[in-house]
Amino acid sequence: RQRQMCIRDRNYILFRDYLCTHPDTAGEYERLKLALAAQLPTDSGREDYVQGKQSFIRSVLRRALSDMLLGKMVDILIDRPLGSHHPKHTDMIYPVNYGYVPYIFSADGEEADVYLLGVSQPVEKYKGRVIAVIHRLDDVEDKWIAAPTGVTFPPDEIEKAVNFQEQYFQHEIEMLDPNGDQ
């Protein structure tokens, strides 16, 4: 329960900070709240009002995490090293190192998942630079793409490297440009 509160508090701060630095998004959020309040004017509509905001909040949190992490160095704990089998789908073998960034939580409430590209040996942990984000359009999770400092990959190579798992999801790739800008 305490972990859930901590995640909720972090997400609230991240959401609030993003709205403060993106006035167009803040305005969009205010318009959404007004529209929902007009549709659900009684106290009995409170649950529907809260639910109506959730997808917007999730999408803002995803954008905020992208803004926060793209181009940054992160410490990755690898829980599925290159060559290992998926814990549930044992026929799936990881062609890349896969892990998570401790204490950075994604929209699903779990620590942010990361594909580590450009490292051809299985590793247990790695400090890499986030070069891209895979936004799953039919799931609440995003997946981060990290690589060694100075190494980049074009979108088609990223797509090929993560296809073993991402083929099951509609997604788009947000890239860090070679100059380090989004």
Please provide the spans of the model-predicted regions.
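A conserved hydrophobic position in a structured secondary element of the catalytic/binding core
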Residues: 2, 21, 101
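Feature detects long, helix-prone N-terminal segments enriched in hydrophobes
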Residues: 63-182
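The feature captures the alpha-helical scaffold/lid subdomain characteristic of nucleotidyltransferase
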Residues: 10-67
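Short, small-residue-biased leader/transition segments that mark boundaries at the very start
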Residues: 3-7
